[in-house]
Regions:
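Metal-dependent de-N-acetylase/amidase catalytic core
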Residues: 3-11, 21-40, 115-187
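Catalytic-core regions of hydrolytic enzymes
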Residues: 81-90, 105-131
Length: 187
């Protein structure tokens, strides 16, 4: 389940792709060209657990899909050092991407210490611009996890700075009450 961003306000709901994410080439192409989907998550496993089915549907329809991870999951495993956790989580994410036939891209933020700075805005904008997406999906901005909020803000800013050149959608973190006030507009 996802929610589309509006150009005027981050939470504005506008009409999205009909039957978004279904395995239907008519919904994932423009003028005969397959759309490129980029999913941006704060941590390894966020893209897959939040919208892995949508990613797979786009791949099955012949579209290129990229998963951008803002961190390497350094704080993701209790009892492990940041380096140990990162090595495990990167391997898991890379393996998940192989299963889904998705390209992984890892950025340089640190899990649990994500920040919004000029340099981080630039890093996110450049990573997204390099992929030339038609559609980007990222975290809903009203989320109890601070890394998810940072990720959402950086992606939203990239959308603006790149001149609204791609459709922006938000995904819900399926962990209970983590995503707040999220009402999907597309499925």
């Amino acid at each position: 389940m996802i929610k589309k961003a509006g150009a005027a306000f981050m939470g504005a709901s506008v009409m999205g792709i009909p039957a978004f994410g279904q395995d239907n080439a008519n919904n994932v192409s423009t003028n005969g060209k397959k759309k490129k989907l980029v999913v941006v998550g704060a941590h390894p496993d966020d893209p897959e657990s939040c919208c892995g089915g949508t990613m797979l549907a786009f791949r099955n329809a012949g579209c290129e899909v990229v998963s951008i991870y803002m961190t390497k999951g350094e704080a993701g495993i209790k009892g492990k050092t940041h380096d140990e956790s990162a090595a495990i989580r990167v391997k898991e994410a890379t393996n998940a991407c192989k299963v889904l036939d998705v390209k992984p891209v890892f950025l340089t933020q640190i899990d649990g210490s994500c920040e919004i700075t000029k340099e981080r805005y630039t890093e996110m904008k450049e990573a997204i611009a390099a992929e030339k997406p038609d559609i980007v999906i990222t975290h809903w901005p009203i989320d109890s996890h601070p890394d998810h909020r940072v990720c959402s803000s950086l992606v939203y800013d990239a959308w603006r700075r790149l001149g609204y050149t791609f459709e922006l959608y938000y995904m819900e973190a399926m962990t209970g009450l983590q995503s707040q006030s999220f009402f999907p507009t597309d499925y």
